[in-house]
Amino acid sequence: IKDNVLLEYKRWILADIMPKKEVEIPYGVTEIGEKAFKNCSELKKVVIPDSVVKINSCAFLDCKNLIEVKLPENVTEISFACFSGCKHLRTVVLNGKLDNIDMFAFANCKDLEYIDFPNSIRKIDEFSFCYTGLKKVELPEGLEYIGGEVFMGDENLEEVKFPKSLEIIDAKGYLFDECPNLKKIILPKGFDLDLVYDDTVSIEYYE
């Protein structure tokens, strides 16, 4: 830790004999550095204090046994590939101040079946939830931008609901590549969905 920034987690404790499965970051740390926990394959749970306001790119990249994460209340962005490759991540608790989910943030989180998005989110960037276990997604009211291939490779994805607030789908037509089980897309009435999807997908509209 330097200047309240956790730069790197030293994964081995007890004279380098026993890997630690749960880590509690001390209160007072304000930032988690880039790749700080990268490849900590033994880590199952990390407790992040509310003093943390920034989690940098790839901070938890390939922590393959990480099961749960609760985002501190003052973090406004999930950075590039922050939790990418956390294939056993099942529980993600987001806060009410989160504004942006960056590229590849949760890519390859195979066990992630559901996520509750707060209405504070304005932007979800491309590839952010590709190759996850998501089954049903309700995008939050307040969301304005969604990037391309966000749900690419989500083989279990069955249903997606878009909010009235959405202004830009920067997907060049593609948002649901490799989503063979997609059955339903729910849209606000009058919304023009210029996307490529299978003919078997039903479109529903709401007021």
Regions found by a protein language model. Name each.
Residues 1-5, 17-31, 41-54, 64-77, ...:
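Structural signature of tandem-repeat unit edges
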Residues 9-17:
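Eukaryote-biased recognition of intrinsically disordered, low-complexity regulatory segments
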Residues 10, 168-169:
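Short regulatory "switch" loops immediately downstream of catalytic or recognition motifs
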Residues 129, 196:
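Soluble or luminal CAZymes and related metallo-dependent hydrolases
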